[in-house]
């Protein structure tokens, strides 16, 4: 009986720890300006924000890795937790790639004027 309860409680604890982990997805608090219209000062300011956002995303991904490392692979629900973790990780990479493409377009447009 105790073993059965333990098997029910452990996954709940694991999911709960993932749900309440301190891995907060960083918010992108800026818009990439139009390179054709932006001033040099605006572009330099945005470059700093882009770099900070990339650094924040790297911290987020490290946090996800650290949280997953705390969970035993022996846990019955480990594969599902690992899958959710990978989805969050990959989504942050895709967001960073989209932002980098947008920034690259703005820089090329700025340099072409």
State where each predicted segment sits.
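Surface-exposed, polar/charged faces of alpha-helical domains
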Residues: 33-113
